Amino acid sequence: MVLVKKYFLQRSMTKVMVDEYLAKQFYNAEYAGVEIVKTPIGTRVIIYAGRPALIIGKGGKTIKQLAQMLERYFGLDNPQITVTSVENPELNARVMAFRLAIALEKGYHFRRAAFITIRRIMNAGALGAEVIISGKLTSERAKYEKLKEGVVYKSGAFLDKIVDRAVAIAMLKPGVYGVEILITKPMKSVDKIELREQPKGPGENMVTVTNVSFIEESQKSGEQK
């Protein structure tokens, strides 16, 4: 039993180490995540990115070097690497965090870049988005700026399935800027309330609301007469 636990623990640690390495190595490629699947003939590695061409490289040179690196330093047996694009990058917190960090490094104003990021996320259909940028934004003293739109859940059941969270860093002359993005996915949540449409037929399942005070005044005037 101990060996089984050790095996799964070691496999999880390897995935985390590979994920951190790929995030640093392919920062500009808008790296989104990785899946590692053990097969009878080797190890299948699926890399998700917003710009897959930067990971593949010219003539597949970069991906061949990456396969050698994964086998030598991370112990992956005969890695077969597949690079695929993210289906909806605007709803992937990691992709948007890297995009925002790259924009800050290019010289965009932090508030303008954050507004553009939130607008793109909401236009993609997200229920909510939150962007937090921290660092020496306007002075020598570090502070943070938070922008939020829509509904962003911070606790509750199935939080990891409803909200996508990612962090990134941007290296600037004043220092290091931290970027954190939270995206509420476009899915039905537990606290969502839907109102039924008004029935087409007249008088069908309809409730008429009458002004009660008007009825009481009419009754009093009738009694006085």
From Swiss-Prot:
The gene is rps3. Part of the 30S ribosomal subunit. It comes from the Archaea. It comes from Sulfurisphaera tokodaii (strain DSM 16993 / JCM 10545 / NBRC 100140 / 7) (Sulfolobus tokodaii). One of its GO terms (biological process) is translation. GO terms for molecular function: rRNA binding; structural constituent of ribosome. Residues 18-87 form the KH type-2 domain. Belongs to the universal ribosomal protein uS3 family. CDD domains: KH-II_30S_S3_arch. Binds the lower part of the 30S subunit head. The keyword Acyltransferase does not apply. The keyword Plastid does not apply. This is Small ribosomal subunit protein uS3. InterPro entries: KH_dom (IPR004087), KH_dom-like_a/b (IPR015946), KH_dom_type_2 (IPR004044), KH_sf_prok-type (IPR009019), Ribosomal_S3_C_sf (IPR036419), Ribosomal_uS3_arc (IPR027488), Ribosomal_uS3_C (IPR001351), Ribosomal_uS3_CS (IPR018280). One of its GO terms (cellular component) is cytosolic small ribosomal subunit. Keywords: Ribonucleoprotein, Ribosomal protein, RNA-binding, rRNA-binding.
